[in-house]
């Protein structure tokens, strides 16, 4: 009986070890891809930063409270920016900007990016990005969320 118990514990330890290794493989699956390939919508941004992240928890509170859509869109952009920045805090901030007049039809479209530099101290702006490529990507990929945040009531 004691021998069977020890064998069972050994098997259990092996299963736990394999489970941890498998979990690590699953968690790192796709991590070698560029962040712009991994974050393609709000759902993948949440997967990237985790559903226990403070910004995701705040978003869920807003959704459950029935908050206005433009506020939800703002929080969605916070989550997306955080995911695209991969946990890094920029010292030069890049952000997408939009034009409200040139495009026939909708009157709102992505129109490039801007940037500014912070000297000396660490600063945080929740909707800014690490580089121009991320700003360009976010502006194009998430244009409709920006529209909901900035224009649509």
Language model features with spans:
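Short aromatic-glycine-(Arg/Gly/Cys) micro-motifs in beta-strand/loop hairpins
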Residues: 89-124
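Short, low-complexity, charged amphipathic interaction modules
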Residues: 1-39
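A short, charged, amphipathic alpha-helix used as a generic interaction element across diverse proteins
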Residues: 130-147
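Subunit-assembly interface segments of extracellular/virion macromolecular structures
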Residues: 149-152
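The feature represents the first ordered module of a protein
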Residues: 29-102
């Amino acid at each position: 009986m004691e021998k069977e118990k020890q064998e069972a514990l050994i098997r259990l330890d092996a299963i736990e070890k394999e489970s941890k290794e498998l979990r690590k493989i699953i968690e790192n699956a796709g991590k070698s891809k560029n962040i712009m390939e991994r974050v393609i919508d709000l759902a993948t941004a949440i997967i990237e930063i985790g559903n226990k992240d403070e910004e995701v928890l705040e978003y869920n509170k807003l959704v459950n409270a029935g908050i206005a859509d433009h506020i939800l869109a703002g929080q969605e952009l916070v989550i997306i920016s955080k995911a695209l920045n991969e946990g890094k805090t920029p010292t030069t901030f890049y952000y997408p900007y939009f034009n409200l007049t040139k495009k026939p039809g909708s009157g709102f479209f992505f129109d490039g990016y801007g940037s500014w530099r912070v000297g000396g101290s660490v600063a945080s702006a929740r909707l800014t990005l690490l580089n121009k490529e991320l700003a360009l990507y976010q502006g194009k990929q998430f244009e409709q969320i920006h529209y909901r945040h900035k224009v649509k009531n």
